């Protein structure tokens, strides 16, 4: 099993899926987890060059999930916004006992 994180602003939805599943099929699971109708439109983005970039629809079915990964999502034409948790800043330095 691999972990797929779908992020939107402060929300993160984590799904455990079988390796080899397409992003398209993972989005169907995301819609079900969010109680959205199957025909609802979600934009999916991947993190490229320090920014979230919307994936083309045909890429969703061609992209196969093989390891833990994360994507941004938005409804309709909303922007792909993901807020970085403030805890990450505090975790930048490890403290040794």
From Swiss-Prot:
It comes from the Eukaryota. GO terms for cellular component: cytosol; nucleus. This is Uncharacterized protein C685.08.
């Amino acid at each position: 099993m691999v972990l797929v994180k779908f992020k939107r602003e402060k929300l993160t939805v984590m799904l455990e899926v079988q390796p080899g599943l397409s992003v398209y099929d993972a989005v169907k699971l995301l819609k079900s987890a969010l109680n959205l109708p199957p025909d609802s439109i979600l934009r999916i983005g991947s993190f490229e060059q320090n920014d979230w970039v919307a994936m083309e629809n045909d890429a969703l079915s061609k992209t196969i999930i093989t390891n833990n990964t994360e994507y941004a999502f938005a409804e309709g034409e909303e922007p792909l916004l993901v807020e970085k948790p403030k805890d990450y800043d505090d975790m930048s330095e490890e403290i040794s006992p």
